[in-house]
From Swiss-Prot:
Name by which UniProt lists this protein: Ribonuclease Z
CDD domains: RNaseZ_ZiPD-like_MBL-fold
Cofactor(s) essential for the protein: Zn(2+)
Assembly: Homodimer.
Length: 307
């Protein structure tokens, strides 16, 4: 089964607290390990929560310090492991300038290539079995959200139809299920569409980054299996949310409702809500009727395949 598992490395906004690290999210997507943001202390959190260090790519939502300064130490740790495979770093405009500085801080030279890529709204990074889409969002500086969208899976295999067509059980069944045609002994060709149902949609994971509620995010999160949305503030901090271009928990929930997202996880909490996020949860649940949770450091979510 193709794995899609999230581990929250840091769930605090702006500054670390005793209980919450700065922003970082590890996503195990199929055989890949991805990071979305890498705040200070992220590598220690990866050790603590057992994600491993075999990271293929890092996607930065923006370049406020609390979202990317952890990459400096993380790259050096990767070098000490003897890594030789390249790592890909993605982010909004200014990524090349800022991340080039991060790569070259310190005396040690990298033992592996570091490839830096700048993204804009609508750009797509293809991966094996899925793609990561960049979504322009509304923050104080250039910022992106991300939608991880799996390829559709083949439809269900109709065993009775396959048998009626004379397909022998065994490897031929597997080939058809993988989308490959099979030639029978009598010369007939059985195509995958002859024995498979309609394609089954892949999963969709959407990560807001720091943002005000915005139409682009609603569009990206349409029918998402999971929306991870920042919820820095509560209702009584609405003015502060607008001023700093962040979201309240209620606003995050409204995005989830308007998008028809299947599940909502709130993260990036102000220190005011560090140990007691119950107000955020209550306000979100008043706006959105689907499952909603407040993330904490070490919180893990595994998304099941769609039927």
């Amino acid at each position: 089964m193709s794995l899609l598992r999230l581990t929250f490395l840091g769930t605090s906004a702006a500054q670390p607290t005793l209980h919450r690290n700065l922003s970082g999210l590890a996503v195990k997507a199929h055989s890949d390990l991805l990071l979305f943001d890498c705040g200070e202390g992220s590598q220690r959190q990866m050790v603590r929560y057992g994600t491993g260090f075999t990271v293929d790519a890092v996607f930065f939502t923006h370049f406020h310090a609390d979202h990317y300064l952890g990459i400096i130490g993380f790259l050096r740790t990767l070098g000490m492991t003897g890594r030789s495979e390249p790592i890909h770093l993605y982010g909004p405009p200014s990524a090349k300038r800022l991340l080039h500085q991060a790569v070259h801080l310190g005396v040690e030279s990298m033992s592996f290539p570091v490839e830096i890529h700048e993204l804009k709204d609508g750009d797509v990074v293809p991966r094996k079995g899925y793609a990561v889409h960049a979504v322009g969002v509304d923050h104080r500086i250039n910022a992106l959200g991300y939608a991880l969208v799996e390829d559709d899976r083949p439809g269900r295999f109709n065993l009775d139809v396959a048998r009626s067509l004379g397909v022998p059980e065994g490897p031929s069944f597997g080939k058809l299920q993988r989308g490959e045609p099979v030639t029978l002994e009598d010369g007939r060709t059985v195509k995958p569409e002859d024995v498979l149902g309609a394609p089954r949609p892949g999963r969709r994971l959407v990560i807001s980054g720091d943002t005000r509620p915005c139409p682009a995010l609603v569009k990206a999160a349409k029918d998402a299996d999971l929306l991870v949305h920042e919820s820095t503030f509560s209702d009584d901090e609405q003015e502060r949310a607008v001023e700093t271009r962040h979201s309240t928990a209620r606003e995050a929930a409204r995005v989830a409702r308007e998008a028809g997202a299947r599940r909502l996880v709130l993260t990036h909490l102000s220190s005011r809500h560090d140990t007691d996020p119950s107000k955020l949860l209550t306000q979100a649940r008043e706006e959105y009727q689907g499952p909603v949770e407040v993330a904490f450091d070490g919180f893990t979510v595994e998304l099941p395949l769609r039927d």
